[in-house]
């Protein structure tokens, strides 16, 4: 596996080739149990993943991933591979090789878009059905020169390996790409050619000198593909660009690895597609490209149209393909023809023959009257075809209809039937296209043959894979036989490689040729008396049939060959005649039509015309075709008689044998393409389909072969490292043992089957499955070891803990014992005397200790001076080292320049040598070629001379014959005509021979000239050769001298010896790439030399830097020792200071206890305290100086390290630059990269050292800072808490009052919400009532619609009854029956009525005129009825529409407000949750703060002895006052942020309440709208007034609430001021108390004589001070609470003020919106009413038409003569009626859409959605266009109705009314446009309001986020303070305990 950095070379394609290291590790660490995880056979998905639950009675219970339980047999359960094998790149390395493992590995990689996977020698690729960036130029460069194991699987890797094998092994290569149609074979073939054209491009050297060449060889190779695709690719069901032929592309390379030429061989072109396609397919692309009219000149040239349906051959399936642009593809095809050097004549012929094939499909023939013979049905198409083919049309038609057939020795004209002629035309079309395609391939090969010297080739085989269809014919047998041969070839090749691997590793192995497994099936097909042999034999017999062929197969093979079987009969499938067992499965074949397909007969008479065609291309295509006619005329053709009857199968076998012989001479590489699904869905994989292809492609066959051998192999070192844990005792510790022996001992000690593995020279080989067993054993072993280790660790930790508990217990006992003893003796008189005397005894000791401290302090100063002197010395040494470094750099640079000069001379000589050798080789080869050409020319010259002499003799003989003929001419007048014809023929022959003679003479002379020139060239080349040999000898001698010089240099610079060796090896490896790199090397030589010198300089610098680094490391260690010494000294000093402080405290205590101490002792104590303070200050100054010195040293050290780091970075950059040029030079990068890695390692070591030093220094600094911080924290906390106490107590009361007010307002809002809910329930009830009404109205509407449809039918019958009343009844009856048969089930009822009417009409023919008058009366009566019905329908429709609209509007509004209410409720809940969480956090902070205060008080009580020191530190407290003030500001800022958060919460609640108010208002508006529809507009106005009054009352209540808030705010301000005054008074009292305490302390010091009285006063003062402190703590806590409450109340007040302003603004907005909605609703209602009236008018017109129809029906029932006319006009007038019905429905739909859009506009006006308004505008424009279309349709219908105006005047009136309605609708649309514009303006205004609200919301959200951030910061600070307080408290407690 390559690292992620190595994958960066592939750019954006890296994730699609190999997953990152992190993803691979995560996948491998997934849980896995090898005993339960498995694959199981599944009926749904073939195989499914699952877990084994139980196994009993020969059945296994498995639970699948989708929680299904399956009970299967043990053989249906397959082992699953461990996670380390997931998405493995080579499936042959799977430890469990089985079908489901392969399937799921492919599937997992495919879902990750890794489409390429190795399977042993195979590369399996899955079609992704989408574009992936895995073919970009950077990917090509990434695979260039990489071995297979060095890069992820890819088609480029296969291609590059083939290319490298060709260069190194000097052996031809082949790449076999197979797969089903649509699997990606053609795309991968293109990528292979693209890769070779990129890496082996010839550039300018490959340009052909011939003027026909239009591009480089690479361009031509690439351009051949689009031309072949145009003529050989077509759309199929699976693939839009399916190759319908196989091809083998050979790309030839020269001696240097450059492209030299290429050629193409094709196989099995599907020529039947030319004349027949399935429905979902189409013919070859070239036909549709021509018809795309991208090149109009082709349309004119080929005499065709642009409509594909004019040509039956190409229009049987689909015409257009969505993924293909035929016009652009035509340009690409035409460009490819030009690039490939086709002449204009060839190009024209190519297009003409393609067009002729299209015309062939239009040729029509008919049967002669009273004969079975065919004759042409028109000659126009034949004329076009003949013109394009260069034939005579009459000859062509005659040859098709009356071909000449040879019977015996005579020719007979045979008449053809129409079917035979059509078959002949189809066969000729296919033959012309096939030969045209083959000629095109030959012509491409001629162009790609550049005559450049070529050495080896790489062949790319793109051929169809194994095919198993429901119907398999001869084509499938050929394809499957090809794959059978290829699979046999693969099996043999694969195991030969395996055998070589085993032989190289020294493993005993019996060779098994798996290629023999397929021999039986192959012999059955191709051997004598095989299937192909019998087929060809049957084709020789004229009376043979498909049945006789089948019988022969049965007789020969059924029961004798295991691979030949009789197929099973399956219902629903086509009949199959025999089955073959292939390696991929059993295939049923049908032999229908095999004999005809194999013979492939052609009309020889037409072929003869082709051979004489004036179209040179057509004549050339059939020039070698031997007809019977030609056979009788020429002797030479008789030799080729057999070839004229060459069958399709024989030709196929010949090509296949040629292909296999080519492949056997190559080293093959296999690519198998897989189609993942049938629907072309990216990322989806159908298991059954993929498994079928894996079997057909031989992938599973390859895995079967792998399982026979040892598929898993591991290097000995890797195996020992990974599996040593299985039995570590088997490998002895402490002594060297070879890895192979260690693996042998390890495997021998494990309980496994020892026949399942073998030991090679470098690897250990395993059978399939054994490696998985070892993995399971390793996992179990690791689990046991980890469990044991955990147990040992837990035991050790518990023992340590127990020891601590025991020690703690003993210490407690000791302390208790000492305390009890002390309590017993402390009241003894002698003990009291001891307490008084002992302090006096220690004074002398104290003086001694002070003296020792002074001495130590002096020593510390001396050591500091010494360290400073050492530092200066080190700085001087550093300067000298830098100077030495610069000198060494100059020296190294000079040496490296000299070395580079020598290397350059050496490289130039080596290059010159290789160039000269290559030139000598080329000259030698050219000389040999010239000699061969010279010999050939000499032979040709002799042959030409012989032919010339023979021609001369022939000419003499012909001249004699001519003289004789002239004499006989005068004598024989009867034969004059024949002789004249013979004479003219002879004249032409003489002229022809004369021309040939002249041409031969010219050729002879040219050959002589060429021979002389070639001889001169040979002589000059020989001279040049001798000169070059001399130069080579000179260069070799100079090379020897240079080698000696190089050896001398290598002795001086041994380090560079490896570099030169690698350079020489890389030069030898790059011989083949030398010509390509010559020009680039010239440009890069100078730059490379500079870089090389720089690199060598940097190497030497790196060595120097390493030395300096070591020195600096030593110096750093010394400094560390000094620092440690300083730390120890400082710790000792600190300890002494603490001891002195403790002793001082003890002295003070004892002084207090011993009240009778003299003033001299007090003065002595003061003096000692002063000295102690002085010593402490001196110590602190020394500490500061020491820290400054350490910081300076660290800075200098950091500077030097940074300088070294910069230099190392420079080296790193140079390394990276050289790595980029690695692919261009490949010379000395390996050694350079190793040196750079060493430098980078040294840099990393330096960085680690620097980091450790910095950590140590930071720790020391941190300790110092903590000591200083601990001294000042208590004082800062005291002053801060005193200032906070007063203000917080006042704020508490203000907050409580505000909270009570807010609770009252909240209750009011809750009541309003309940009222809204009640109103919503009432609306739901009203909605249900409307729904019932709507349902009943819809039912009525349906009834009326059915009546309307009946009236429409009557109208149609009327129109039919009024046409052609005087026709004969019998004729119309027959027509009526014919029409009735064609009608559908809808007319069954009409047919019965018409039959009855026809019978009535036959009886009452004479009474027609009398009943016409009655029809008129009936018509008038029906018109009245229709009008009445129309009025009812209009009413019902209007009522239904109104109810429907009400229901829709109410549902929409209700749904919208429900969603809004739910969203608001969710927001409210979220806000409440957030508020509760914030309050809990606040409460926690308060509790924590109170705990901190309690701890502080305990600390103060416990440390009362430090009061004297606190008094001395008052000055420091004053200095820190500023810091306290800043902290106070930050606290206030945090509290403000907290208030902002609370404000945001309140704003959210206010927004919720505002939304609820909106809901109330909108519901009221809805109520108004409904009442407005049901009642009058006046009532609606009153409701709006009522709504205004309600809003006014709401405003008044809000105003009163606002006034209350203002009053409460004033009250809160007053309370705040009062509490601030109280706080100031408390602070004054506290300051007085502090001053009194200070005065008391001073008084204590001044009074000496009255010590006892002063002591009593002092104790009283101290107790009073402690009481004051306790009171102060209580006040501080209360002040904090009050402060928080004040801030909350202040925020609440500000929020209330803002809410009031917002409510006022929203009230104004809502009033304006109500007015606006009112006006909009009024206008919309008017518009709706207008639309309803228009709709009713349209319906009335339709009802008029229906009345007319009913009148006409009455007339028709009474009119007998009109029945016949009605039958004739039935179909036409029903179409007209249907059109009118569609028109009516369209109009109704248009009106409904307009109503719907108006409703949406209403809603949009409420919502203010600008985008919806725009959509509405676009929709109205569409409606305008639809109305215009409907206008046109209506005018057309009016025109149609005018035809019947003469007979039905009523319909004229209706058409006029229709036009009026259309005009009214147009006016209505114009009005709607005006309305829409007004809506648009309103929407824009609403949008502006929405934007304003949105900005407010964003601002509030931003403030909330900032407040949260500030709260987090404050919380972190509080936590830090709390932690520091705890630390300080604990330290004080420890000190106190130690003092006691």
UniProtKB/Swiss-Prot annotation:
Disulphide connectivity of cysteines: none
One cellular component term from this protein's GO annotations in UniProt: cytoplasm
One biological process term in Gene Ontology: sarcomere organization
Sequence positions that bind ATP: 179-186
Subcellular location as annotated: Cytoplasm, Myofibril
InterPro entries in UniProt: Kinesin_motor_dom_sf (IPR036961), Myosin_head_motor_dom-like (IPR001609), Myosin_N (IPR004009), Myosin_S1_N (IPR008989), Myosin_tail (IPR002928), MYSc_Myh3 (IPR036000), P-loop_NTPase (IPR027417), XRCC4-like_C (IPR014751)
GO molecular function annotations of the record: actin filament binding; ATP binding; ATP hydrolysis activity; calmodulin binding; microfilament motor activity; myosin phosphatase activity
Keyword list, A-Z: Actin-binding, ATP-binding, Calmodulin-binding, Coiled coil, Cytoplasm, Disease variant, Methylation, Motor protein, Muscle protein, Myosin, Nucleotide-binding, Thick filament
Tissue-specificity statement: Expressed in fetal bone, thymus, placenta, heart, brain, and liver.
Stretches assigned to the IQ domain: 782-811
Coiled-coil region list: 840-1933
Domain Myosin motor: 86-779
Record note on what altering residue 517 to Y does: In DA2B3; uncertain significance
Effect of residue 178 to I: In DA2A and DA2B3
Chain spans, region Actin-binding: 656-678, 758-772
SMART domains: MYSc
Positions carrying N6,N6,N6-trimethyllysine: 130
Pfam families according to UniProt: Myosin_head, Myosin_N, Myosin_tail_1
Similarity comment: family membership: Belongs to the TRAFAC class myosin-kinesin ATPase superfamily. Myosin family.
Its job: Muscle contraction.
Self-association state and partner proteins as the record states: Muscle myosin is a hexameric protein that consists of 2 heavy chain subunits (MHC), 2 alkali light chain subunits (MLC) and 2 regulatory light chain subunits (MLC-2).
Protein name: Myosin-3
Organism: Homo sapiens
